Amino acid sequence: MEHKRIVEKSPEEYKTISRSVMLCLILAVVDQITKDAVVNAIPMYSKKTVIPGFFDLTYITNPGAAFGVMEGKGILLLTISMAVIVAMIIFFRKLCDGWCERYYALLLVVSGVLGNSYDRIFRSSYGKFCDGEVVDFLSFHIGDIPWAVWPSFNVADTAICVGVGLFILSNFIRPEPEKNDAEKKSA
């Protein structure tokens, strides 16, 4: 079966966009529901073992980005996040290049950015607007080996990583976009 690009502004493209936007919204809601469940069920810095020696639910917060980078820079992180979303919206069709999986990939990233941005805006323990911390709770490890612990993360982080990975993979396996006549002449 030959995989073809989706034609811009076609019913197929609108259907793909609708489905990927729906997935984006569902994941953003699931992210917040799971974070609320953890906040209400597990005391801060505590854990509930799900699979002994491998997987725990651990309630922690992260005042920065991935791995604690840019700690305490909530406004800057929000500004960067919103700039990324705006750029993705402006260049959405160009970035997708008609490949179905790229629509989903980009909107997975948007979903994760929205989920973590919500935390930065509304989950402030000090009552300051836009000074919140992201709730992380998924904790994987191998036994009690100190170097075999992955930093805790959440549904939004997962959506971002899967979206970025899918987009990169798509760029490796899909052909380059065809150049139009003007681009061919200048090359």
Task: Give the label of every model feature segment.
Residues M1-A187:
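Alpha-helical transmembrane bundles and membrane-interface segments of multipass inner-membrane proteins
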